[in-house]
Amino acid sequence: MMAVAEASQESLKQRLNVSGGNGLKGTLRVSGAKNSALVLMTASLLSEETIELTNIPSLTDIDGMSAILESLGVQVDRQSDCIRLTAAELSGSAPPYELVNSLRASFFSIGPLLGRLGHAQVPLPGGCRIGARPVVEHIRGLKALGAVVNVEHGIVTASVPGSKKRLTGAQIVLDCPSVGATETILMAAVLADGVSTIENAAQEPEVQDLANLLNSMGGQVSGAGGPLITVQGVERLRGCSNYPVIPDRIEAGTFLMAAAITRSPLVVEPVIPEHLSAVIQKLRDCGCSIQIKGRAVTITPGEITAVDITTQPFPGFPTDLQAPFMALMCTAKGTSVISEKIYENRLQHVAELQRMGASIRLEGSTAIVEGVAQLSAAPVTGTDLRAAAAMVLAGLSAKGITEVAGLKHLDRGYDDLEAKLSAAGAEVKRNIP
């Protein structure tokens, strides 16, 4: 627990010095998906047997989730990109606030704890400060499955009434296709009595990855990846070995945009192309040639021209790539309109890009971006995870050396970003005071 806090404090003091004007070359390797790995780790709470996950990225968020699971009695064994989780005997159902506060994904523990133990007490989550990300849908779904849920003083307490301590299958219709709510309900329903359906379910690849893991553990989940998911509850789930986390589509998209903003031909792999269809289409629209061969994506940028994007749930353009794409559009020919429809406070990077000479006008949750000939280096701060990535990308194309602060955010979601970029020809150096 202390080690996680110390790592976060250390990264607060660090800066990333990014020298602009260097092209990229070769291949950038994509790590396992952060947003999938965190949820799959919490699924270990559903079984008494060992869950072995591979292709786990090296991130502070993974360290934080490991600490949360250990606080609940899970044995965690991490070796390189493999993690073994054994929840044979859980010692508690209430993860501590000091761990949960910095990691939004910690709230995913409520579904497995409730499904297996019949009770859970989880503080409301933390993570990036990019606007309201309520858990109303999560709670409504748990109540539909028969849980009694109370929220008081920032803590969500949930329990299953009766002697069986077992949830009951139900028909659940989400008001919006929330990824977190879909995954929470899915993990709670897998051990419930009877059949559950989730209508208007999130269709993101990370939901599919969770369903695939649960099925490999003996669950009966069908329809994941579509708007209707059906879950036939089972008595128990077994362990599983060597389950690979899907490649991180957001990291892959960031790398493709790094190639585009530096006007560099590059290979990005491994990528599941259908996970990035909307992004690949927009990159093609703005002047990039993209070739796909298996899980390798080769991008060859031409003249970059402005295109418009609107963030949407999958399979639309992902909100997590809005900031990096805006950095690219700052260097494009023409005017682009970027509309953020998922989170109301996810345009904080605009002010930082303006410090680098970007021409951006805000109208509510929409940014109008006039491309400029070249950005100029400046000291900037990544105000959240994806904003930090956008600052790095802007620095790669800017004149001079850009100093990027806010690395605690970057380290939450990008596995050794500076080393990967440096290996591809960028001049990126972490300044440790």
UniProtKB/Swiss-Prot annotation:
Keyword Transferase: yes
Top-level EC class: transferase
Catalytic residues in the record: 128 (proton donor)
Location(s) in or outside the cell: Cytoplasm
InterPro entries linked: Enolpyruvate_Tfrase_dom, Enolpyruvate_Tfrase_sf, MurA_subfamily, RNA3'P_cycl/enolpyr_Trfase_a/b, UDP_GlcNAc_COvinyl_MurA
EC number: 2.5.1.7
Family (UniProt): Belongs to the EPSP synthase family. MurA subfamily.
Function field: Cell wall formation. Adds enolpyruvyl to UDP-N-acetylglucosamine.
Protein name: UDP-N-acetylglucosamine 1-carboxyvinyltransferase
Organism: Synechococcus sp. (strain CC9605)
